[in-house]
Amino acid sequence: MKGLKDKVIIVTGGAGGIGSATCKRLAEEGAKVAVFDMNLEAAKTLVAEIEANNGQAIAIECDITDRQIVDSAVKSTQEQLGPIDALVNNAGWDVFKPFLKTSANEWEKLIQINLIGMLNMHHAVLPVMVERNHGRVVNIASDAARVGSSGEAVYAACKGGLLSFSKTLAREHSRNNITFNVICPGPTDTALLAGVTEGASNPEKLREAFTRAIPLGRLGQPDDLASAITFFLSDDAGFVTGQVLSVSGGLTMNG
């Protein structure tokens, strides 16, 4: 895709699943990738794989819920790679249970990771983009935010907030030539989905139910999401902002 060579791009939750696939794809497109993750060893392993394929990446240990750590991670990225061109807010966490069976501690963790962490990243990175009058932001939400999902009430609330937040920033920063778009994954074959299914009485049956519900007949793969994310970051999407794209194999449709 056009315009990604030598661009400095941060990917949060970059060491696994959708994040890992996105980092690899961006490196293949010639971008300089900062892999932000709490699991530094996993991030380093991914960076080594990217470098072995002639890509450029760095591993940064980052807890997005801690603003001081975020600021330090952003500073380190710019010292090593240069000014930040784009941000992918991919880090997330979920707990799968009916709302009345959740606890206040679980609400707090869900909100801190899925909402506050994302706010921290935007607040730390956007000034760089505003100063340069250019930037791309892709936020990873969920189809749970668009249509609801039983057992994910607080997660869906956080991701729904991310949709509105992204559209608002798309308006506020259009004059700064910064685009904001949102990807809503459907059921995707990642560790997050595995965590959801493992909590069921029959995990394999639940996976099969997810698969049957998808018109294209399979679970999403991380590479499916990486392709959509890469498009929104590229010059090919230069006239696209404030949009929400479901990547779900047709599980949810709108128009």
Per-range role (PLM):
Residues P98-F99, E106-I111, F210:
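Substrate-binding pocket helix/loop in short-chain dehydrogenase/reductase
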Residues S142:
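Residue(s) in the substrate-gating loop at a strand-loop-helix junction
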Residues V147, T230, T241-G255:
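Short C-terminal tail/terminal secondary-structure segment
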Residues H122, C158, S166:
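Active-site helix of classical SDR
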Residues V88, S174, T179, V240-G242:
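Short, small/polar-rich loop/turn modules that mediate ligand/substrate recognition or access, typified
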Residues P127, R171-R175, G238:
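Alpha-helical segment proximal to the catalytic Tyr-Lys
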Residues L100, V147-A153, R175-N176, G217, ...:
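Active-site loop immediately N-terminal to the catalytic Tyr-X3-Lys motif
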